[in-house]
Amino acid sequence: MSSPIRNRLQLVVTLIFCLFFENVNGLNNFIDNFETLNYRATHVANQVTRRKRSIDSAASHYQEPIGFRFNAYNRTFHVQLHPIDDSLFHEDHMSDVDGGYADIKPSHFLYEGYLKDDPNSHVHGSVFDGVFEGHIQTGEGRRYSIDKAAKYFERDDRPTQYHSIIYRDDEINHRKWRVKRDAENLSEQMQGCGFSSRVRREMTDVQNSGESTDFFTNYMTMGGRSKRANTLRDHDGLYFVRTCSLYMQADHKLYEHIRMKEGNNDPIRTREEIVSLFYNHIKAVNEIYEGTNFNGIKGLHFVIQRTSIYTPDSCDRGRAKTDSDNPFCEENVDVSNFLNLNSQRNHSAFCLAYALTFRDFVGGTLGLAWVASPQFNTAGGICQVHQRYNEGSRGWVYRSLNTGIVTLVNYGNRVPARVSQLTLAHEIGHNFGSPHDFPAECQPGLPDGNFIMFASATSGDKPNNGKFSPCSVKNISAVLAVVLKSMPVDPTRNASPVGIGKRNCFQERTSAFCGNQIYEPGEECDCGFSQADCDQMGDKCCVPHEARGNGGPGPCKRKPGAQCSPSQGYCCNPDTCSLHGKNEEKICRQESECSNLQTCDGRNAQCPVSPPKHDGIPCQDSTKVCSSGQCNGSVCAMFGLEDCFLTEGKADELCFLACIKDGKCTSSVHLPEFSANRTNFLQNMRKDKPGLILHPGSPCNNYKGYCDIFRKCRSVDANGPLARLKNLLFNKRTIETLTQWAQDNWWVVGVGGLVFLVIMALFVKCCAVHTPSTNPNKPPALNIYQTLTRPGTLIRQHRQRHRAAAGSVPPGPGAQPRSGAASAPSRTTPSARPSAPPLVAPQVAVAVPPGVVGPPIPLIATHPGSSSSTPAVIVLEPPPPYTAADPGSAMGGPRRGHRKNKRQTSSDAAGSSGNGGKKKGK
């Protein structure tokens, strides 16, 4: 055998060997390269055991850090962990399993920390049986994932040499499953997200069919104001609320998979593993959204408010049992219908509601979500309430369009954690208003990779995989600008439909965020998100948020040698990064109505508490009194009375301060304590006038309105001309007045009704002549333009039409024709030609050319008593639209809306050919 042939055979054998053993060293189609971990976990387990024993003791509030080390990727990882502070879970977080309350304590098994030799690193995950599972991000930005081996092996096939694996994010292989996806020969390559063009059209139709309701009425009646309605705004008028509450659900498919894998067939362990799964996903999503500047909107944050876990015990043959509310029992559903199952529930109490599953959807789809829009008339996305939508043949149905779904399986393989986390961030991006990245400049590809909102799932190892493109930032910023301009509402209280308008359900953040220029617990300083923010603030002593992963002291840390930062308080010298001394008498707080001036004490960067003034001093234009240095005391309480609201009277009367005296709410104008000759509680511009008038912006009419700058009580919905017109026509007093007047003057109502009917009849009669008709016996419609410009022509044309109609009546039997009628046929000009000839014409002689055989003459019976034996002849002419006309005009063609290609019979075909011959001969 020659050498070239031998080399070719060796090459073929090598290729076959590589293809056959392609996945021998890989866990699945996603992970090819990994390293095993088998560190001793006894010391970790002891820490967890000691914690469980002391959960009821006071010492359980604080837990000593736990640590372990292992070697992988030619380095040593020395991990330091401590229990989470629950900042990722809402203060009212609740868990349920199959609808029943479940006592799950996330702080008992969830941990976060850092690498001991890398202070800028971050570690988060869970610890079960002394084994850690989670993610590590080094100070240089490299990411590692640690998974239990039980996730990839059956219970009887689990390895005994190691308990965990570790792999880098850049070792996630996407080439194989993309080949499989392309091999499906789909008409549309979904590539991870199910938001195809067909699905987009269907979802858009639903989003635009929402039922509108009265926003202002529901807003006030349902107590829509948030716990702190006086939340600050920025220079663009956007409220400083950045926390989005989440409702996380796991269906029975995901529960069953985790129970058979890392759950070890233990129900309690399984539900804790699912909560850990939720935690790791939202933790990764927060890192992405908190680190993104959406055109000035920074610090978006997500908290888990409720978790629901559904088990197979709640389903029976694809349906929920009678005592279960599991919405996901249906077995064989596609991705869009699975999203509909989640959307059928009422999720108005949450910013977003997501369902995680282990269903292998067609086309490799990993997720789907409703896309938000900045348009008020388009529903869907963040904060959308549960309301009715018109779905065509299905009629009106209730939907919650603040929903999305994510699956953890793709073509039979469990998706790596980093991929599913980016998928969740991608679908939430849809909820925030971003479609898929487009055009080409937002799809850069290699070497930096595509962005989060790319239609295909990404591995997460490229620099752009965890970032939003400029296109996505623009789209999300537009939606947030509309939502955050609305007053924040408490979604747990205001859960009723408030129309298609954008509801602001974001809440104030309870945990610290590095980059919001607010000094919070756990931070050394906070000068801003970027270095430009710090420069604008005049702080050169603090490290900004964007310095994460660049080495140095780390974000929100003081620079080396700095004693303090101006972000900590006014008592820090921005030039020297040191405290102002007490002898400098640096003023840090000016005197106010209820507190005295305060200077720095040289011990802290924050300004000391100002000495309060005496209680009872009038403040806020004498509508409040000082209490412990704050202007929040009650004026009525100074006289032993209680505060109340006036609810009856004119608008300018409702803005007076009122107190309850002798069991009645009385205006301060009529109280002797606030007479015109009083010596205290004097108001500006109201000297020698009785009563106290409320400050502009104060609530009035029992919180149904507010006092404007003219000190008049303005209703919340009385902000525009339409609202004023509605109040004028449909308020209770107007309706009662009109009803009483109609009862007293019933005869006027009757006469007016008759006059109205007569006017309408005349209107219809006059306008009927301008309405076209398909009846060939009726005259053509008149020109409305001539009637409007020359009203006199309407009467003349009306008379002419009657005369023409009288002259076209065929004579009765035996009637004599008019002189000359038989000698010559009448001629009419085209303009005066009627729309159709009479069906029966007088008997006239019809000249037939010699040699031409005319059409057969239809006969009719003669009139009884008629002496004429000649039968009458019916002269038939084709009715419109077949009336002879100029072929070049529109009248020569068929009527609009009718078929042109009418099927012909054999006789019709013969007639057509004959007619065609005649035309040709003309």
UniProtKB/Swiss-Prot annotation:
Cystine pairs? C442-C471, C542-C577, C564-C572, C588-C607, C594-C626, C619-C631, C636-C659, C644-C665, C655-C707, C700-C713
For biological process, the GO terms are: cell fate specification; embryo development ending in birth or egg hatching; membrane protein ectodomain proteolysis; nematode male tail tip morphogenesis; Notch signaling pathway; positive regulation of transforming growth factor beta receptor signaling pathway; regulation of axon guidance; regulation of mesodermal cell fate specification
GO MF terms held by the record: metal ion binding; metalloendopeptidase activity; metallopeptidase activity
- Compartments (UniProt record): Cell membrane; Basolateral cell membrane; Cytoplasmic vesicle membrane
Which branch of life, at top level?
Eukaryota
Entry's transmembrane regions: 746-766
From the Swiss-Prot or TrEMBL record, give the protein name: Disintegrin and metalloproteinase domain-containing protein 10 homolog
Organism name: Caenorhabditis elegans
Phylogenetic classification of the source organism:
Eukaryota, Metazoa, Ecdysozoa, Nematoda, Chromadorea
What is the gene name?
Answer: sup-17
